[in-house]
A protein has these predicted regions:
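ABC family nucleotide-binding domain
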Residues: 1-221
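C-terminal boundary and immediately downstream tail of ABC-type ATPase nucleotide-binding domains
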Residues: 216, 222-243
Length: 243
């Protein structure tokens, strides 16, 4: 589904954000990417759907080479859901309108079809009663659940999450993670950048640990939490799990 091969990413001539990164995400697999701040994990996930260009290597998404200049990136991005740290909802649109816009403009669905799909997804994330509200009327956790529903409305082949809970108050985190756990258990292909090790230990098939732009460890969940191979991963886990 997602193939990342020897990827390099530079910001200017002096800072290399990603260094020879190679990994993959199979169909139906949940892969968590973790690591300290500045390790390159958010950069990596943004490169998957070309929100950030790469300077070396290849990224293949469902058989399509992302970094090929001939690739229709808007069309490709429409097939991959992306949920950001900050919810990126349109503040001037009601919640149901946020869910309908891309369905109508990108997928060509009728307004009635889009509303039906959006309403079904709002029910799925527990927000049916908020369809006619504006984003500012919702809590951060509710807005993030709307963002997930909006991504799902496009019937994505995979979902990318870039620290989806890091901007939330602690009491709101679980409501977002619960939706993500349900998605994982339904077989959605997911690549998730997060510090939520409870989520990773519950649903991740594999865990990738990054540091200083490198993939230091790429292991099965049980191996990563049971006996990480690298000193850097061991120190990271001991620090995270001690809080």
């Amino acid at each position: 589904m997602i193939e990342i091969s020897h990827v390099d990413k530079w910001y200017g001539p002096n800072f290399q954000a990603l260094k020879d990164c190679t990994t993959s995400v199979a169909k139906g697999e949940v892969v968590v990417v973790c690591g300290p701040s500045g390790s390159g994990k958010s950069t990596l996930i943004k490169c998957v759907n070309a929100l950030e260009p790469i300077q070396g290597g290849d990224i293949i998404l469902d058989g399509i080479k992302v970094n090929d200049p001939r690739t229709n990136l808007p069309k490709l991005r429409a097939r991959v859901g992306m949920v950001f740290q900050h919810f990126e909802l349109f503040p001037h649109l009601r919640i149901i309108e946020n869910l309908c816009l891309a369905q109508e403009k990108v997928l060509g669905r009728s307004h009635d079809e889009a509303v039906a799909k959006g309403s079904k997804l709002l029910d799925r994330v527990g927000l049916t009663d908020h369809a006619q509200k504006y984003p500012a009327e919702l809590s951060g956790g509710q807005q993030q659940r709307v963002a997930i529903a909006r991504a799902l409305a496009m019937d994505p082949i995979a979902m990318l999450f870039d620290e989806p809970t890091s901007a939330l108050d602690p009491e709101m985190i679980s409501e977002v993670l619960d939706v993500m756990v349900d998605l994982a258990r339904e077989g959605m292909t997911m690549m998730v950048v997060t510090h939520e090790m409870g989520f990773a230990s519950k649903v991740a098939h594999r865990v990738i640990f990054m540091d200083q732009g490198e993939i230091v460890e790429d292991a099965l969940r049980a191996d990563f939490f049971g006996k990480p191979r690298s000193d850097r991963a061991q120190k990271f886990l001991s620090k995270i799990l001690s809080h």
